[in-house]
Structures are given as C-alpha cells and as structure tokens.
C-alpha cells in the first residue's frame, strides 16, 4: 500500500540521518539538529517521521515559504470544479502541534556545508547536523518568450505549483465565453508529473461539456 511504501521510505531516510544507530541508542544521546528544506510531500513527510522514529529526540526544523500545504496531484480537481482549494489544503501547524516540528516560514538562499548552516532570505542562519533537501521544482518561464511577463500579469496561468494560480485558472475557465478557445501547452520532457497536462485537459474538456 501507499502508506507502507511511504513508511519504508521514511524509515530508510531516518536510519541514514541517524547514522545507522539503533533508535534506542539515539534516544539516550544528545539531540541532533536536522533541517529540512521544502515542505512538499517529501519534506513534510521526512520531517514528521524523523521526529516519530527518533522518539521525538531529534530537533527537526522545516523551512518552507508557504503556511499551507496544497496537494498538487489533486489540484486538477479544483480546476475542473470537483473540489475546492480548501479541500486539498492542510496547514503546516499540524506538524508543530502533533509532532513537534519547528516551522520557519522563509526561503533558503545559501548552504555552508563546512560550517553546517543554511542562510535564510531574512538574513538569519540555521545550524544543522544533518540536512534534507526537498525543495521541489522551479519553473523555466524564460524558455518561451513573453511567458514570464504574461504569467506575472495573471494573463497566462500555469498552476504547475498548486495554490493561488489553481484558483485563478478555475476563474478564467468560468469567465470564458461560449465558443472560446482553450490552449494548453505540454512542457518538453522530462517534467514533473507526466500525466498532469493530460489530466488537466480531460478536466477542462469535462467542464466545457457540462457548461
């Protein structure tokens, strides 16, 4: 099952970060500091299970610029009108309240591997014993002339990262006149979530069929 695979993956990660020591030995030793960069599926899951599998002995800090996790694989359901954005969103406060993960809402701008510190956009630094990198993707909007400006103005929305643009894209669909043309561009491979564009095209076609 997905839960079992997820548990095995995070168990392996925890074992690596704990230096291969048994959890019973780790629980008696001084706390180690782990900084996790990125609060997507990988980063949030790693932060949660590092706390759990260390008996809450590890000091885990998650650096993520957003205050809420939005499920990207479910976002096309929002575009298609089957779900609302709040139904696929989860605040990160649950990681702090339920698992003791420290949250830092910011971006990482530099990593000093010798000093074992990460520098934040606000100028502060965080020390670490172990570092987990899970920042996700970035968008190469400059690859198509004019796309960056059109995206910044809200004229062309990609919604490749689920969130405000997902809602914006849905609103654009609702505002389209009858007989209007919808254009969807599929990025050159390799790209994140290969089925994504085809799922979106299907959801949009279903919306047009109904309305």
Model-derived features with residue positions:
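N-terminal secretory signal peptides and thylakoid transit peptides that target proteins
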Residues: 1-18
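Beta1-alpha1 glycine-rich phosphate/pyrophosphate-binding loop at the start
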Residues: 28-102, 151, 188-211
């Amino acid at each position: 099952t997905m839960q079992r695979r997820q548990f095995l993956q995070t168990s392996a990660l925890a074992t690596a970060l704990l230096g291969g020591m048994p959890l019973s030995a780790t629980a008696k030793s001084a706390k180690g500091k782990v900084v996790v960069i990125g609060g997507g599926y990988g980063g949030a899951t790693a932060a949660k299970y590092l706390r759990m599998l260390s008996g809450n002995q590890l000091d885990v800090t998650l650096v993520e610029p957003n205050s809420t996790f939005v499920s990207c694989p479910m976002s096309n359901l929002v575009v298609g009108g089957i779900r609302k954005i709040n139904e696929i969103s989860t605040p990160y406060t649950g990681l702090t309240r339920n698992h003791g993960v420290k949250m830092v809402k910011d971006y990482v701008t530099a990593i000093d591997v010798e000093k074992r510190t990460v520098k934040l956009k606000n100028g502060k630094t965080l020390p670490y014993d172990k570092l987990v990198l899970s920042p996700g993707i970035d968008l190469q909007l400059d690859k198509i002339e004019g796309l960056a400006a059109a995206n910044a103005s809200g004229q062309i929305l990609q919604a490749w990262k689920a969130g405000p643009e997902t809602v914006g894209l849905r609103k654009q669909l609702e505002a389209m006149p009858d007989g209007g043309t919808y254009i969807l561009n599929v990025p050159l491979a390799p790209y994140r979530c290969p089925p994504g564009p085809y799922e979106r095209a299907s959801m949009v076609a279903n919306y047009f069929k109904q309305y």
